[in-house]
Amino acid sequence: QEISRYIEDGTLDLGLTGIDWIMENESDIVVVQDLIYSKVSLRQARWVLVVRDDSPYQKIEDMEGKKISTELVNFTKKYFADKKINVQVEFSWGATEAKVVEGLVDAVVEVTETGSTIKANKLRIIHELMKTNTQLIANRAAWNDPWKRKKIEQIKTMLVGSLQAMGKVGLKMNVSKKNLEKVMSLIPSLKAPTVSTLSSTDWFAIESIVDAKGTRELIPRLLEEGAQGIIEYPLNKVV
């Protein structure tokens, strides 16, 4: 939560933090790279306005004069002020959703990825305040230093490569010339599969990067169409 402040004041040259906490701290930093992932998916998370499922509140305007609890106090205050809705915003030290469940506050502003916990606690989302994701950020002086900037760019490349590899695997296989076209038609790829001629001119080696979740169906189909010696291997980076 405080990383953007350390980046801004030069304590750190480079760091990872969320868009939400950059906005909360109003930090003056350089955004080097958006990194779209969250705890359970490769999607952005959302900051949402949440009320009890049985509450009468249906929209953000219904919060006029109400009490809201959140960890994102400064952003929330500004958000409601910009909409000219008067609310009392208090800081939450944790267990934010429990406060609205127990009736300690009228609503909470909380971060969510899937919304499943909110539903499980018999709560309801009535408004989305913003989407957030991790960003690689740099101190402005560090970014303007050629040596440091080169190192920062290298780190960015490795992080992006790791993200692009998530959920993907590599596939290798051998295919005879007569089955090549049928097998190739089944293989998805980032661009096009790599095809190499084996020592026997009637056989080819195919290599491709595919979504891991699809291999359970893909591999049996490849075998049916004549692929042999199929190897599936994990990926660390795709650059």
Over which residues does each language-model region extend?
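Extracytoplasmic small-molecule ligand-binding "clamshell" domains
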Residues: 1-6, 13-15
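Short glycine-rich loop/turn motifs
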Residues: 46-47
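Generic hydrophobic-segment detector
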Residues: 5-8, 112
